[in-house]
Structure formats: structure tokens, C-alpha cells
Amino acid sequence: MSVTQPLFSTIEPDEETTAPSGNIQDNRSSKPRPEPIVLTPTTRSTSSNSNAQNTMASNEGDAEAGIAGIFRQSAHPLALFFLYFFRIAAILVYILCGWFTDNYVLSTVTVVVLLAMDFWNCRNVAGRTLVGLRFWNQVDEDGESYWVFESRDPSRPANPIDSKMFWIALYVFPLLWGALLIVSILKLGFAFIPIVVLALVFNITNVVGFTYADRDAKQKWANSVVGGSWGGIGGIGGQLLTTAVKKGVGRVFG
């Protein structure tokens, strides 16, 4: 190689490249476009959630409803139990005694004992603990008898479940004994009518006594509220009147 030969003549030129022509979007559109993927939510999770919610709701309903739920929410479950136990036992013994024994005296004594225990328990234990009411008949020195009603302090309200179940037991069972009296008359079972009449006497006595005791308690509470409000208004009015008189006297003689 001679020195005088130029250097660029020895370098091979690059290959000629043609610039792309046409519309680029046309080239892209010529290729097949992939189908769009649509994501749809599955119902598996929602169904599982709904099943879980239904399961939880049923569990809560089972926890809050039924006999077990009532006793669980009661503030005095033992008193509530014996209130219904004596009443249901007296009716069951009266209805089923003829199927197990033909001894009329034994059946009568059993029903009367259950009725007496229910009468004492309802008046002295269940009424006092479940609704805060109590009543008794008292005879003074002159020989006159009168009813005495006792009620709980209004600041300590009764449990709603206890109150509801107590009043249900108080009013429903006399209706059941009344129905049994009608059945005894229709079946000409006159031997058992005295037992039903005694049951009605015990139950109606409790109904009347606790109804009047509840009315007396509400009246006392209303009187105390009204008396307290009027007393408060009177105290404020007295203070305002005293202040106005003092200011008026000071202006006249000042």
C-alpha cells in the first residue's frame, strides 16, 4: 500500500438501508390483535361470605332465642325457673294424674301443694326479684284489713326479660286454668272442679295484687317526679323573687 493512497478508499461503505415507508399504524393493524381479557369476579367468595354471615346470624339467633337464651339473658334465672316450674307442674299433674294413678286423694293433695308453693313463691320470691313488686294483706288494731304494696326503687329498673316473662306467666296460666274448668264442666268431671277453682283463686289473687302493686309503684314514681320538678321550679322562683325584692328595696331607699 502506497502512502499517497487516501485512507477512506480502503474502508468499505456500509450497506444501504431503506427507511421504512408508509403508515406505522397500518403495519401494526396488519398483525392480528389479541382478544381482550375480561376479568369477571367469581361468586365463590361472596357465597362463602354469605354462608358465613348466615351461619353467624343463625348462631346469634340460637344464642338469643329459645329457652336457653331467655335464661341466659335473665338476671335471676333461678327465680324465673321456679316460677314456671311450679305452675307447669301443677297443670301437668292435674292433667296426667289419671294416667298414672287412680288415687284421687294423692292427686288432689299433690296439685294443691304445688299450687300453694306457686302462690307463695310468686308473691314473695318471683315478684320481688323479677319485677321488684310485693304485696300482702295486713290487719290493723281495729280489725280492718288493707293491702300493702311494696316496690323497688325506680333508679333500679327490672331486667326486661325477667319483667316480660313474669307478666306472661302471671296472665297466661289463669287462662289455662279457666280452659280446664270449662273442659271439666263439659266432661262432667265435678270431682276435679274444686281443684281448678282453688287454682283460679290463687292465680287471680296474684294477678290482682301485682297489677295494683305495679299501678301503685308507677303512681308513686310519677308523684315523685312531679313533686321534684315543682320543687325545683319553686326554688328557682323563690331565689328570683328574693333578688328582685332586694333590688327594688335598694332602689327605693338607696
Swiss-Prot record:
List localization entries.
Golgi apparatus membrane
UniProt membrane topology term: Multi-pass membrane protein
Give the compositionally biased regions (Polar residues). 18-27
GO biological process terms held by the UniProt record: protein secretion; vesicle-mediated transport
Q: Which InterPro entries match?
A: TVP23-like
Q: What is its main location?
A: Golgi
Q: Where is this region: Disordered?
A: 1-59
Q: Which UniProt keywords apply?
A: Golgi apparatus, Membrane, Transmembrane, Transmembrane helix
The UniProt regions of compositional bias labelled Low complexity, in chain numbering, are 40-59
Say yes or no: keyword Iron present: no
Q: Which domain of life is it from?
A: Eukaryota
Transmembrane region positions? 80-100, 104-120, 166-186, 190-210
**PANTHER family xrefs:** GOLGI APPARATUS MEMBRANE PROTEIN TVP23
This molecule's function is given as: Golgi membrane protein involved in vesicular trafficking.
Q: What is this protein called?
A: Golgi apparatus membrane protein TVP23
Which species does this protein come from? Answer: Coprinopsis cinerea (strain Okayama-7 / 130 / ATCC MYA-4618 / FGSC 9003)
Gene of this entry: TVP23
